[in-house]
Amino acid sequence: IREVSKGKLFSYGKKVIIIGILLSVFQQFVGINVALYYAPRIFESMGAAKDASMFQTIVMGLVNVIFTVVAILTVDKWGRKPLLITGSIGMAIGMFAVAGLAYFDIIGISTLVFIIIYTASFMMSWGPICWVLISEIFPNKIRGQAVAIAVAAQWAANYLISSTYPPMIEFSGALTYAFYGAMAVLSAIFVWKMIPETKGKTLEEMEELWKKQV
């Protein structure tokens, strides 16, 4: 039974499975859940008072909602790939800027501005669109198993990134944020080179696409 199941899973080749896993991993490795879980601590480490850091966290929450709506309104108009690449570039700019501010120990509203740029970029792209792509790229025959693997990879990546943030930030705040910025750059390259555009394509068309690549 296991051999049959394994054969079915790889009936369209391993590439589509690997792409699904990497899509999930990159969604977490850009550091979004660090920004969400540790937002007050990040702002306090940059010199904000406790009350101010909580207010800034609330602002981030509003940004999350607004730019998720932006993604909903634009995903079928602009396509998945352009939004993902644009989001990756925005996240990279935000994280590298925060890394620079941390390195030079610059405290002020600029930190909030660049974290908002980072968060907004994620929420208009990788936040919702990763899930859209996971539901669209896998052929019907393997969708159940493939989606389960991609989701498992996402939770594993989430745990890894979230649990390593405290020791990383203790070692170097600048390098920590630069790492997330670098992951954002890699995610843009990954989407550009590896992800097929699914806008306007039927599940049958996606199935044929993967068949040709086996």
What role is predicted for each listed range?
Residues 1-214:
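Alpha-helical transmembrane bundle of multi-pass membrane proteins
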